[in-house]
Each structure stands twice: as C-alpha cells, then as structure tokens.
Amino acid sequence: MNRNRMIRVMIAAIATMAVVMGIIVGCGPEWGDGAADSGAARTAANGGTRNAVSVTLPSYYAKNMVFQRGKSITVKGAATATDGSNITGKQLTATIIQGESSDSATARIGKNGTFSCSIKAQKASLKPYSLMLSYNGSIVYQLSRVYVGDVFVAAGQSNMELNYTQYYSTKDVAYNFGNGLITERDLPRQLVDSNVHFVIADHVAGGTSADAKTGSKTSDDFPLVSAYNESSSWLSANNHDSRHLSYLAQQFAMQLRAKHPNVPIGIIQTAWGGTPISRHLRGGDIYANHIAPLRGFHVAGVLWYQGCNDAMRSAMAMEYETNMTALINQYRTVFGQEDLPFLYVQLARWPNYQYTQDVRFAQLRTLNNVGLRNTSNVGMTVSIDTDKGTSALIHPLGKDILGARMAAQYLAMTEDSDNDGASGNGSTGSKASRNIPSGPIISSARHAGSDGADNGSTNNRNGSSAGNGTNGNTDNGTIVLTFRNGTDNGLKAMKPNYSKTASATVPNYAKHPKATPLDGISHVATNTSQALQGFEVADGSGKWVSVNATIKGNQVVLSSANENLGGMTQVRYLWSGNPSCSSILYNKLGLPASPFIAVVD
C-alpha cells in the first residue's frame, strides 16, 4: 500500500470511528436517518461533550440530496453553543466520505453563528456518500446518504410545475383534462427511477429578511412541500412520489439518465403556477424564498417555462425581454457560474391571451440580448408544434417532446458533439456553444437586390434591423429571409402533426451511442410538398397580407402575385397566439423555426 493510499484509509477509519462513537454516546442523530428534525431545518446537537454545539443546515440539506458533480460542495449553516458559551472563531470540519475515500474542509464560525466551507469536487456515483460535520473531534451533524450527480432547477409557472398530484387529481380535474379533450392515458409517462431525487419548494409568499448582497428581501430558509417534510429527505422518483414532480422535469431527467446511466439526477423544483416573471426576479417573493436561499449551491443548469401570465397585458409583454435577460443574469449569479446552462421553452400555442406572440418574440430576442453578461449556453426550445392537438388547453400535452429537445440542447452545451444544427445563441466562443440544436432563427429580411449583409443579430420590432444593409434595387418585388448561421442547414417544409400520435421516447444508446434525444422524437412532423404558410408582410400603413414563401438553399424568398413587395417594411411569421398552418419551416434536425417579426431592409 503506497503512502497516499495509507493516509486515505487512515482518514476514513478515523471518521468512521468518530461516527460510531457519536452514536454510542448519543451525541448525534440516528445513523441512516439524517440529522434530527427541527422544524424547517435539520439540526443535530452534541449534547454530552465540552463546548457542545447545535448545528443547523438549510432545509434542503437532507438525505437523498444530490450535490453537483465536478463542482465544489458547499456546506453552510449556523452553529450555537448548547451551554451558551462563545464559539465565535471556532472551527467546524465538514467531511464527505465514500468507502475509503474522504475529503474535508474547515469552516470558521462567525459572530452571528453562521459558517460556510467548500469541499473539493467529487465524482458522480450511484453509490451514496456520507456527509458529516464535527466539532472538537465529535460528530455534531451527519447525513448518511447523499449523492453526487447533475442537479437542475426547474423554475417558472404552471407548465413547468405541472404534475399529477396538483393538476390531475384535484377538484379542477375537469378543467385540467379539458372536459374530455385528454384522459389520464394521454398524460406523459411517469418517471420511475430510484436514481432521480427531487425536492419541491412550497408556495410561500413574502420575504422575511434582507439579502446583504442585493438589498432585496429574502427568506432565511427554503420552504418545502408537505410531501418532503413527511419523509425528511429528498423524494425519489418512484411510483408514488413521482406524482409530485414536474412532468417536464421528469421527461428531461429521463433523457439524461438514459444517456448517462451512472449519473444520478437531482431536481430542485421552484416553479409556481399563475405567476408573472417579476415575482421570480430579484425583489420578487419567489426569488426571495425559492432562489436566494440556494445561493452558493452548485447546479448543472436551470430549466425555465414561464410567460403565459405576462401575455395578459401589453405592458408586461413589452417588458418581458428585459426581465428575462435580467433573470438569466441573476440566476447565474446565485449559482456562481457566468455560463451556467439556461434552457427555456418558448410559449406554446394557446388562443386566450392577446399578447402571446409578443412574449414569444421577447423570448426569441433574449437569446442574443446585449444585456446578457454571457450569451453562451442559453437555449430556447420552440414549442409551436408540440401540443399534440391540445392547444385549447393552457397546459397542453407534449412535455415528452419538450423534454427531449431541452435535453439535446443541454448535452450539446456540456459535451463534445458533432451535430449539424446548431447555435441558437449566436456565440462563437466554444464548440459546445456553436452546436446547440435549434430550429431556424431569423437573422435578416431584405428586399432582393439590396446590398445588405447579415450581422448575426435578431431583428426587433421598433425599427432597428438584423441586417446592416440599406434599401437597394427592389424591382423584382421579392424579400429574402436569412437565418442564423448553423440553424439554416437543410431548410424544408414540414407538416406538424397536431395529434396524440406525436411522441418522444428515449433512444437506445447501447445500439446507437452517437444518438441524441432528438432521435427519439417521432411523428411530430412529416415532410410535405405543400408551400410554406404563415408568412405575412406589411407596408407603412400596417396592413398585413399573406405572401408566398419558397425555400432556396438556406434562405426563404417571399413573393406575391397580387402585391408589389417593394414597398413592404415588415415581415412576420406565425404571428398568432394559436397558429394552425399545415406547412411550416423546419431544418435538417427536424426542429421548427421560431415565430418572429422583422423589419425589412
């Protein structure tokens, strides 16, 4: 046995002996049950030793929790002396153990009793670790079963929160099933996987203390739903408990687990139905209670589906791009990573709010907003073709398709890939950023013959343009649309399948190791020879007329037998809350183009 291995064995042996002694003298919680329960937080007291302390960690530190692989493990909390003595400046030691291996870090107790330390990053493993804190050589807190894998925050409103317990087994069952439009048989396949663990934030409004860094009100702890408190642990995705978890998060996790079967998945669900984005931003109560308490806890990425409430009023829709940009920046700050993967869903078809298309466009423009501190690893999933014919429902079907598309984006962001579709965010800094699977994203609209060149930014609605050219020869009366580089490969017309036969399953990676989650999507759309639909143009009067659209290479050319397009100043595509076209634009990945509105140069 070499010297380094001998040292590791000795450390593990000493730690194990300390745990055993803690159990024997009754100075720690029962082994296997995590720390003793004390209200919302979990505490453990070393009641029989000199200078004994009681330690409290945040409520989401509990057995079955998942720490992020490849990143340092933050251990934070508060300590008080049980005999009232002053322990300011004293040290706690945090240790994580698996088998013969262990790593430790020390934390100095501050004046207010708080402490924080970081243990070095650990490898993903289906085998549990143990986490313990010691003071003066005695165990004062321990969790016997924690995991290291990939952790995601599932945030937003009801289409992210949507789960069986809250939405399909309640008094509103008729509303949620659309009075027979769907049945339980149509709901997404439930995830049953003991290596997926999750915790859900309870709906608690109002902040309770000031965040020193931001000045906004934040909660001291993370509120948890009753299902969590009953078990005092993160729930596992079994037949019973998966009913509480977001369907979209389940489908996303299902895809990642198939791709990486030796990596556990953790989900922290903070979504809250019926909420505007402002409540999720710094200064809002959801940010205060659900996001700020996670500061310093490392995650693999954020999953976001929200915007319906902001489509109710024009003012909210017009502010959405600014708010969405701020939210991405703020969440990345909380989790300590400037290029943290942030995956969000563009609003699905739904006819009932007037400004749905405006929010969709704001979501599109966020991808390349100059306010983003880092445009890498920001991905938008277009959902215009995923509802399986249930667009009359505010919670449409299709979460399996969305989960597969989001998983494909995440894997492209975090792994070396060689896919051909690509960047929805315009970044050219890294291979992963260039290869984020995306449908066609509008880059420029110009009159044929104009001497314009694409500068890679998205058109906006107030007169600025994606192209940097000027009006030129418009004699032929056609308009040429170009799409962002990489998203324009293999443009084609496809007919969306708005029926329940559309689906997404998990690819067989054993047989096809180079497959992606997109390969499991089937019957969502089929090739068609029918002309593209959904394109409209307008002149200065603001009158919109439909036009013909023809694919020519990696461009779309607009023309009209009845209208002279030379004087047209705007173009838009699928500009409706609930478009129902039978031939829409896709690329070679089978991903649909985002709806848009653009100024014509």
Give the ranges of each region predicted by the language model.
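Bacterial N-terminal signal peptides
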Residues: 12-23
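Cell-envelope and extracellular/periplasmic
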Residues: 33-34, 39-456, 463, 467-601
